[in-house]
């Protein structure tokens, strides 16, 4: 969940498998007094979309899935979509240049990359996507769909796939 000072919230991926996870998520939104305004999906694998219906129905949102590359029209946030196929053909990253943040889903992880052995995966395509992603400023904070945050600079130095 990404928030601004006015407590508007963008939800990135809705990987809530079970009801207790959904309840915990809803409690967090309520406790922090957040107002969800968008649900962004990085790619349509179950671990990123299984809570999509819950989020859509609970907060009256329509998920943004596989948007066109370019600027997203979402109030309060400057979000740029970067197409990043390879792990899955519909994969995208969400870059927030004003905050220097990148949400990568399963495209880029700390010192690793997304799998390409699943349907829709292709290593050559993923490598091309990664070459575009690492062109972002070195101090860009990277938030992958799994694991720990990292930076573009760290990945350029230590990721064996780059």
Please name every model-derived segment:
Residues 1, 71-97:
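Core dinuclear metal-dependent hydrolase active-site scaffold
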Residues 1-27, 32, 93-105:
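Conserved beta-strand hairpin/beta-sheet module of binuclear metal-dependent hydrolase folds
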Residues 9-11, 39, 63, 78, ...:
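Hydrophobic "anchor" residues on beta-strands that sit immediately upstream
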Residues 16-80, 161:
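Active-site HxH/HxHxD metal-binding segment of metal-dependent hydrolases
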Residues 16-17, 88-162:
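Metallo-beta-lactamase
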Residues 39-49, 82-91, 143-149:
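Histidine-centered catalytic micro-motifs
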């Amino acid at each position: 969940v990404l928030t601004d000072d006015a407590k508007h919230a963008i939800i990135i991926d809705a990987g809530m498998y079970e009801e207790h996870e959904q309840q915990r998520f809803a409690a967090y939104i309520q406790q922090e007094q957040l107002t969800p305004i968008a649900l962004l999906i990085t790619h349509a694998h179950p671990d990123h979309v299984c809570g999509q219906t819950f989020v859509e129905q609970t907060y009256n949102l329509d998920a943004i899935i596989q948007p066109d590359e370019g600027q997203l029209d979402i109030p309060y946030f400057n979000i740029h979509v970067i197409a990043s196929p390879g792990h899955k053909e519909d994969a995208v990253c969400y870059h927030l240049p004003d905050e220097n943040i990148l949400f990568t889903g399963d495209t880029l992880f700390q010192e690793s990359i997304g799998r390409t052995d699943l349907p829709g995966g292709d290593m050559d395509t993923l490598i091309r996507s990664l070459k575009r992603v690492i062109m972002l400023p070195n101090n860009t904070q990277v938030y992958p769909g799994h694991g720990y945050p990292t930076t573009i600079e760290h990945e350029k130095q230590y990721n064996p796939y780059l």
